Amino acid sequence: MGKKNGSSSWLTAVKRAFRSPTKKDHSNDVEEDEEKKREKRRWFRKPATQESPVKSSGISPPAPQEDSLNVNSKPSPETAPSYATTTPPSNAGKPPSAVVPIATSASKTLAPRRIYYARENYAAVVIQTSFRGYLARRALRALKGLVKLQALVRGHNVRKQAKMTLRCMQALVRVQSRVLDQRKRLSHDGSRKSAFSDSHAVFESRYLQDLSDRQSMSREGSSAAEDWDDRPHTIDAVKVMLQRRRDTALRHDKTNLSQAFSQKMWRTVGNQSTEGHHEVELEEERPKWLDRWMATRPWDKRASSRASVDQRVSVKTVEIDTSQPYSRTGAGSPSRGQRPSSPSRTSHHYQSRNNFSATPSPAKSRPILIRSASPRCQRDPREDRDRAAYSYTSNTPSLRSNYSFTARSGCSISTTMVNNASLLPNYMASTESAKARIRSHSAPRQRPSTPERDRAGLVKKRLSYPVPPPAEYEDNNSLRSPSFKSVAGSHFGGMLEQQSNYSSCCTESNGVEISPASTSDFRNWLR
């Protein structure tokens, strides 16, 4: 019976270990154990003295099994003191009849507690092992997934890098293949050109050789036809004759080739010489053609006509003395700011002044020459011969000066003034002394050159304006500018104004020679 109970208790312990520990199961197990015990008591009834050892014997065997089950499990603090509290009184000096019931009651109370705690510990161990196994499996799965993912990513990156390297290598291979093909093509083309040139040269040489061979063969045939001897000859004699003919043909070919080469060289040299001669002829013909073209140019006629027109225009040369300053006294002398008259007006006033009687001034006068600034007008020796001097000397006490005007024109001013004097009134007619003075001044004076005169001759002004026509000298009152209002009263005031203007011009410009570019300003000032 003890074995059965032990086996049943072991099976129940195993079953309880695999079941989830709950309070209901624990209470049910306790109730089942009590019911089994009751059934056993019903079937096996014994006296009380015998039942106690049976009970003790029935209860005592499972104790070591439970202890063997709980070897690994730590004993709880409640069980240890229970053993300590229960065992000492059993060893006390009492009769065995009193000890047995106490042991049975203690065993009855301690057995369910031990079983309960053993089941709990076993269940906790199982739960922990299962949970730890679950965690380990989950970590393993996660690790496997991570490893797979890393392997995939790394494999993708590696494949991508490998593809890029392969593409780069393919591109390099393509470029190298193209370069090699191009080099091969160029070398092939060069070889073809060289081969073509060589073949062309060989063809030309062969062609020349064929021609020479044909010529030699024809000559040999002609010579053979002419010189061939029908008489029988030995083989040695025939060989000698053939060798001789071949030698002559070779010499003839060599001479022909040398002649052809010399002719070719002569042609090239002749062509070069003819080209050089042609270039020399062209260089010699160019200036001739240029001269002919310049001789027939269209603007030459216009230039010649312009020169002839310029030669026709006469230019008045006025000589003004600047070596000696002019003296101005009295209130009748005009101011510098007044505007001088035009060239035509000056000529008119010179004509009107010529009608007054005047005496020569003792003061020495030196002429200042106002020459032409235009390079177009050239001197004519006939005009130099036909020069006429016109001088006017004032006898007024306030102004003593002597002007000398030289006009390069076909007719002199003095003759025109003398001829026009008859048209003037009697009170304006010139006297005999004035006419004699004019005649005496008409011839040019020959003065010896001195250093003072040479130095004074350097200080000159250049002006050019055309000589007015002779009709202007005939009218005395009509040729006046409308802007010239200051001399409308009398000729004497005009004379003073003009003389003062000339003196101011000379005093302001002492030591200055006006260039042709600056003559326009002086013309504007004289207007």
UniProtKB/Swiss-Prot annotation:
Disordered: annotated span: 1-98, 300-401, 434-480
Protein name: Protein IQ-DOMAIN 18
Function according to Swiss-Prot or TrEMBL: May be involved in cooperative interactions with calmodulins or calmodulin-like proteins. Recruits calmodulin proteins to microtubules, thus being a potential scaffold in cellular signaling and trafficking. May associate with nucleic acids and regulate gene expression at the transcriptional or post-transcriptional level.
Motif (Nuclear localization signal 1): 2-9
Places the protein is found: Nucleus; Nucleus, Nuclear body; Cytoplasm, Cytoskeleton; Cell membrane
Bias (Polar residues): 1-11, 49-59, 352-362, 391-401
The keyword Cytoplasm belongs to this UniProt entry's keyword annotation: yes
Organism listed in the record: Arabidopsis thaliana
CC terms in the record's Gene Ontology section: cytoplasm; cytoskeleton; nuclear body; plasma membrane
Compositionally biased tracts (Low complexity): 75-92, 330-345
Molecular-function GO terms, alphabetical: calmodulin binding
